[in-house]
Amino acid sequence: MEENGAHEKRWIILGIMSLSLVIVMLNNVTLNVALPEMSKDLKADNSDLQWIVDSYALIFGGMLLVMGALGDRFGRKKALQLGLVLLGTASAAAAFYADSSNDVIIARAAMGFGAALVMPATLSIVIVVFPREERGKAIGIWTMMAGIGAPIGLLVGGWAVENYDWQMVFLINVPIILLALILGLVFVPNSKEDKRTPLDPIGAFLSVAALGTILYAIIEAPSLGWTSPEILAIGALAIVMSYLFVNWEKGIEYPMLPIGFFKFKGFSLGLIAIMLASFVMFSFMFTQML
């Protein structure tokens, strides 16, 4: 560790965090190019294919806040390594053992859980190992790697399907994840919160419930209809859970998500822009690959 608190191998660590982040982001999109082959091989209909794609996003998005908070409390390196192991194991299981759409959906859900451990841990580790004066540049590089993960995923997925089969889309994850695991074990330092703040189990439950119901409604609405009773009920539940989550986080001393962040216009507008761009990009890719 240098005098200013910076880790002497921080740029190597940033490279490892970037690689880990790319693994998370490319798994959002690699499968899209394999959907036609999977539809034939697994006899999957459009609803099955949508769940194969979205089970990853549902668990990933629903568990992201909780896994980030647990990683900060119990150890960011542990969270990173555990998440990569889950991603690699689920990828191998899908490649070698999945023979139905349900098998792939379960594997993708497990991958989403692993990704929810990895992504927040990578950012937290970057923040810890870089001094304040270099932190903005490091986070900018981290953000850039998140952005290029999707196009890399399309290229990798296209190559795998063109030259092999849809199973290779999963199998290709394994050596990349092994590389990230080994490099992480060697170079990434252990870190966690210095001050043991109380856990927020109620906030964790409400965040998972709110994000899960929102994502479920968005996933199922195209097939069930936006005005169907089920979607309206789930949408209403999502609003209630979101309201309860926000009010709970406002009222406790150590919130899992400080609501005050949303008062900053740049933060809020940036989130809205990312959300809209993601909706457009992933909707386009899903419909065009079928």
Feature-to-residue mapping (PLM):
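Transmembrane-helix bundle of Major Facilitator Superfamily
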Residues: E2-V186
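Flexible interhelical linker loops that connect adjacent transmembrane helices
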Residues: E2-N4, L181-V208, K250-K265
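Membrane-interface helix termini and inter-helical loops of multi-pass transporters
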Residues: K40-D41, Y216-T227, M256-I259
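12-transmembrane solute porter fold
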Residues: L14-I23, L31-V33, P229-L237, M241, ...
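Hydrophobic alpha-helical interface/terminus motif in multipass membrane transporters
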Residues: L35-M38, V126, A160, V188, ...
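Hydrophobic alpha-helix/TM-entry signal in multi-pass membrane transporters
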Residues: R10-M17, L80, V104, L199, ...
